[in-house]
Every structure is written in structure tokens, then in C-alpha cells.
Design a protein with these regions (language model features):
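Conserved SGNH/GDSL esterase-like catalytic core that processes O-acyl groups on lipids
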Residues: 32-121
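A generic secondary-structure signal
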Residues: 92-93, 124, 128-129, 216, ...
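Alpha/beta-hydrolase-fold catalytic nucleophile elbow
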Residues: 105, 141-142
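A short helix->loop->beta-strand "cap" motif at the edges of active sites that frequently abuts
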Residues: 133-137
Length: 226
């Protein structure tokens, strides 16, 4: 599932976003991304973390194409229930509607695959999305880190592998004129792991922190009235 609903906070304090934590990597030549306040014209594509953003954060009028098991290997083969409650495949959705901005955040479910095949399929998948929506600004989201405890118990789902994939995603964004957005700076501990107090399962933030994540997206990219 997307979010964890516990109420534990790492230090009993609410997160406040510093100026340093609201900086996106926006390559030169990338289209300017400015979101409408109600997120209309925005599409979020992703896995369980995006499901969490949809269920626990306020994505307003955004469309969401996300599923807990989603990966770049299954993205164009799955159907998902949209805001309208109708089911749709991604290609059908991208061919029938026009989006201003598309957020793309996948990668954690892919980590068990051969690494080179992950990067190649990720690139192919993003390129296909862009071909179907050539006028949309593409935002590639870094994969959220896991906690130190979660990482220590797995040779696959650990932050070394997540960081390697995130570096390749960032390079892809820079090479293709997309925007790269890394939320880990908001939720990491001092050692670069997902801070344990933000999570109960080691891989997702608690339900209440998805609204912090959405606020960070708004502050980082900026919003304007429709």
C-alpha cells in the first residue's frame, strides 16, 4: 500500500522546509515547470509512493496513474482506476488527454532486475511517455531511500542500489532536458538513509508526511493560479 498511517515523528517536531531543501535540479534548456495551485493539468505516474501521495497528500485536480507494484517493465501493460473511477491503460490516457506536467517516479520495484536492463527500460519508458505528450514538462523523481534497518537486511533493496539508480535518472534528466526532483533531502537522516521515525515499514513515509512531500513539490517548483 502507499502510506503508513502511524503518527510517530522522528523528534516530535513538524518538518519545516529550509531554502536549501527546496531546490530542484533543473538543467539548462529544461522547460520551466510552474504548477497550477490545484494541480490541474498534472499527471503523476508511479508506484506505491505515488499511491501514498494520492491517498494522503493533497494532489488536487491532478490525474494519478499509479499502482503499488508498478515498474517500468509493467507500466504500459497495466490498467489503473483514474479520478473518474474509470479504468485506463497509460497509452490510452496519454493519447486521449493533454497534460502540462508529468511527474514520473519509478524504480524501487525494479531493483531485483539486472541493473543495466533497469536503466535501459527506464529510459525507453520515459521516452515513450514524452513521445505521446511532447509538449508536457517531464519531471523525474528520485526514488525515496529506505531506512538503515531495511537496507541492512537486503542485498537488493538498499540505498547503494537506490543511489546508483537515482544518479542514472538524474543524468538522464540532464541529458534529455527534463527536471530532476530529489525529495530525499527532506526525509533523510544524517547518514543518507530514510530517517526511521518517518516510517513504520522502512520503505514508505508515514501517512501524515505525504502532505509534507506535496508541500515540498509546490515550494520547489512553484505554483500559480489557474
Amino acid at each position: 500500500a502507499g502510506g503508513q498511517t502511524g503518527e510517530t515523528a522522528p523528534s516530535g517536531e513538524e518538518i519545516s522546509l529550509s531554502e536549501e531543501e527546496t531546490v530542484a535540479s533543473e538543467p539548462s534548456g529544461a522547460p520551466a515547470v510552474s504548477l497550477k495551485e490545484d494541480f490541474s493539468g498534472v499527471l503523476f505516474i508511479g508506484d506505491s509512493r505515488t499511491v501514498g501521495l494520492s491517498e494522503y497528500g493533497d494532489l488536487g485536480q491532478a490525474e494519478v496513474f499509479a499502482d503499488s507494484g508498478m515498474s517500468v517493465f509493467t507500466l504500459f501493460n497495466k490498467t489503473v482506476k483514474l479520478r473518474s473511477q474509470e479504468k485506463s491503460g497509460l497509452e490510452e490516457l496519454l493519447c486521449s488527454r493533454k497534460f502540462d506536467t508529468i511527474f514520473f517516479m519509478l524504480g524501487i520495484n525494479e531493483l531485483g532486475y539486472d541493473y543495466d536492463s533497469i536503466v535501459k527500460q527506464y529510459k525507453r519508458t520515459v521516452e515513450k511517455v514524452h513521445e505521446l505528450q511532447p509538449d508536457a514538462a517531464i519531471v523525474l523523481g528520485a526514488n525515496l531511500h529506505v531506512t538503515a534497518e531495511k537496507a541492512s537486511g537486503s542485498s537488493i533493496y538498499n540505498n547503494d542500489r537506490i543511489n546508483a539508480l537515482n544518479r542514472d535518472i538524474k543524468s538522464m534528466a540532464e541529458a534529455s532536458g527534463y527536471v530532476y526532483l530529489d525529495v530525499n533531502q527532506v526525509f533523510d537522516d544524517e547518514n543518507g538513509n530514510l530517517a526511521a521515525g518517518y516510517s513504520s515499514d522502512g520503505a514508505h513515509v508515514l501517512g501524515k508526511y505525504y502532505s509534507v512531500w506535496v508541500d515540498w513539490i509546490r515550494e520547489t517548483l512553484g505554483t500559480h493560479a489557474g
